[in-house]
Amino acid sequence: EKPALPHIKRDMIDFLEIPHFAINDIKAGGGWTTADGVFYPHERLVTPAEPPRSYAYCSDTRFVPELAETLRGVDLLFHEATFAEADAARAAETMHSTAQQAATLAKMAEVRRLLIGHFSARYEDESVLLKEAQSIFADTLLAREGLSLAL
């Protein structure tokens, strides 16, 4: 998401009788001077906007630690976790990632939450992948059909 503008404090706008044409200037960082010459700074006339939400995904890829800087601080990272660590050699051969590698990248990038998916069919019980990832990055979820997450 793009950063949003701050929210106008309607009670202050009404109390100070600020005309509508001045609202956009105030949202953009300006203040207001009353007819009596009293200046009200921007911070008194607005409340901060919610920070923008962010989502990133890494799928069909090997472990790329250099991505950490690009992914830094995202709210939700989807990362493939095709293999368990026991199959790390197979992951490298096929240019895929392990659950631990996905979690390591999430930790390096200081993301808020990690969603792992793109599992190999060899795992009937994907909880082994979840446990491996959570051992490194606790806030990890398994992707499931129909899963809905609020950011």
List PLM regions with ranges:
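Binuclear metal-ion centers of metallo-dependent hydrolases, dominated by the metallo-beta-lactamase
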Residues: 63-151
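Active-site-proximal loop/helix segment associated with metal-binding centers of metalloenzymes
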Residues: 1-57, 61-69, 76
